[in-house]
Amino acid sequence: MSVHINAEKGQIADTVLLPGDPLRAKFIAETYLENVECYNEVRGMYGFTGTYNGKKVSVQGTGMGVPSISIYVNELIQSYDVQNLIRVGSCGAIRNDVKVRDVILAMTSSTDSQMNRVAFGSVDYAPCADFELLNKAYQEAQKNNLPVAVGSVFTADQFYNEDSQIEKLARYGVLGVEMETTALYTLAAKYGKKALSILTVSDHVLTGEETTAEERQTTFHDMIKLALHTVS
């Protein structure tokens, strides 16, 4: 067991999907997996293990933001030797060529978090996705006629931020804004593990367009199926 996860060794699979919302973790496990077992309820941050197409897969809620996901990724790797970590979450689009309901494969991530400045000092470390997972996800999307955008995302340290650089980031090719990918990719690199963020565009920062609950659910289904096909 670790501080925030009370699973026994062997209860967590080598591959873990990481939604931010613990209730979304519960939904994923109950909807997509078979032979489901709940291994964690500490602080209400649910974790489940089941099988998908015969492959053992876990789903662990992470909470929101760099500090929260860092806790769970550290513990999953250090205490349970997880090898593959796939974030499945939402983001806000910041470019006109990225539409609401699109799915983004995050190739790399920039951030205003101080996480890597603390670790690397004056060096601007650029964390990126594992190429094998990224390529597999892209190929699966192509095979299933699922449109995806591949590129950079921005991991914001604040959800409400009046002093943002959104327009400049968009000019530099950043596709969307979220709150966790930089931490995931950095920690995966630190420990020699594989990581990928697959994101559903739930709203558009520039136009104000948002998805309805029903539309989010449909696109969310595409994202989860893509993640599961990538690792199965």
Curated annotation (Swiss-Prot):
Role, per record: Catalyzes the reversible phosphorolytic breakdown of the N-glycosidic bond in the beta-(deoxy)ribonucleoside molecules, with the formation of the corresponding free purine bases and pentose-1-phosphate.
NCBIfam families in UniProt: deoD (TIGR00107), PRK05819.1 (NF004489), PRK13374.1 (NF009914)
Residues involved in a purine D-ribonucleoside binding: 4, 162, 178-180, 202-203
Name under which the protein is recorded: Purine nucleoside phosphorylase DeoD-type
Catalytic residues as annotated in Swiss-Prot or TrEMBL: 203
Family to which the UniProt record says this protein belongs: Belongs to the PNP/UDP phosphorylase family.
Residues of the site described as Important for catalytic activity: 216
One GO cellular component term noted in the UniProt record for this chain: cytosol
Quaternary structure and partners: Homohexamer; trimer of homodimers.
Enzyme class: transferase
GO molecular function, one term: purine-nucleoside phosphorylase activity
EC number(s) stated in the UniProt entry for this protein: 2.4.2.1
InterPro entries in alphabetical order: DeoD-type (IPR004402), Nucleoside_phosphorylase_CS (IPR018016), Nucleoside_phosphorylase_d (IPR000845), Nucleoside_phosphorylase_sf (IPR035994)
Binding residues annotated for phosphate, in chain numbering: 20, 24, 43, 87-90
Reactions the enzyme catalyzes: a purine D-ribonucleoside + phosphate = a purine nucleobase + alpha-D-ribose 1-phosphate; a purine 2'-deoxy-D-ribonucleoside + phosphate = a purine nucleobase + 2-deoxy-alpha-D-ribose 1-phosphate
Source organism of the structure: Bacillus velezensis (strain DSM 23117 / BGSC 10A6 / LMG 26770 / FZB42)
